[in-house]
């Protein structure tokens, strides 16, 4: 079984939902960079204090800090398998992450790209009822995603580890498709 995984996909594709299901089903550790950052800040670790200073200014935490936090978590207890969600977001981050993981002998084994058409994504995001989920904002987020993520798709495809998943259908169907693609269905 592939036990070092990364999820990619546009906003509304169901990455978080599918990551949670797969981790529960396979006993993987779900590494959400947002959750890891918040945990470091709450623990007031040196990395957390540095991240808090940046976050309190409304700025993005540097790639170096995020990579350090990911590395710390991986070396702690993620040897048995993990799924990384929410990072990387651009090609430089992907290349840095790949180097880091190779250095600790934990290279990514599969990158799951959940694909959906824009209209389905927009419908899903609008149904969440969040105040910032207007059609205009959602379309802009999709544009930004495509601009930043297209190079990641090519990068991981060139490494031979990209697996495309059709995200249409209900949660259980997509989960089954993912497990099947990873060879987890008998």
UniProtKB/Swiss-Prot annotation:
The record's listing under Pfam families reads: ADK (PF00406)
The principal location of this protein is cytoplasm
Superkingdom, natural source: Bacteria
Q: Which InterPro entries match?
A: Adenylat/UMP-CMP_kin, Adenylat_kinase_CS, P-loop_NTPase
Q: What class of enzyme is it?
A: transferase
Q: Which reaction does it catalyse?
A: AMP + ATP = 2 ADP
What are the GO BP annotations of this UniProt entry? Answer: AMP salvage
Record's Gene3D superfamilies? P-loop containing nucleotide triphosphate hydrolases (3.40.50.300)
Which annotated residues bind ATP? 12-17, 128, 169
Q: Which residues bind AMP?
A: 33, 38, 59-61, 86-89, 93, 130, 141
* Coiled coil segments of this chain: none
UniProt keywords (A-Z) are: ATP-binding, Cytoplasm, Kinase, Nucleotide biosynthesis, Nucleotide-binding, Transferase
Can you supply one Gene Ontology CC term for this chain's record?
A: cytoplasm
Task: Cite the GO molecular-function annotations of the record.
Answer: adenylate kinase activity; ATP binding
Region LID, as annotated, extends over 127-133
Q: What EC number(s) are associated with this protein in UniProt?
A: 2.7.4.3
Q: According to its UniProt record, in which pathway does this protein act?
A: Purine metabolism; AMP biosynthesis via salvage pathway; AMP from ADP: step 1/1
Supply the NCBIfam families for this chain: PRK00279.1-3, PRK14527.1, PRK14531.1, PRK14532.1
Notes concerning its domains? Consists of three domains, a large central CORE domain and two small peripheral domains, NMPbind and LID, which undergo movements during catalysis. The LID domain closes over the site of phosphoryl transfer upon ATP binding. Assembling and dissambling the active center during each catalytic cycle provides an effective means to prevent ATP hydrolysis.
Q: How does it assemble?
A: Monomer.
Q: What is the protein's known function?
A: Catalyzes the reversible transfer of the terminal phosphate group between ATP and AMP. Plays an important role in cellular energy homeostasis and in adenine nucleotide metabolism.
| Protein family membership | Belongs to the adenylate kinase family.
Q: What is this protein called?
A: Adenylate kinase
Query: Which organism does this sequence originate in?
Result: Prochlorococcus marinus (strain MIT 9211)
The gene behind this protein is adk
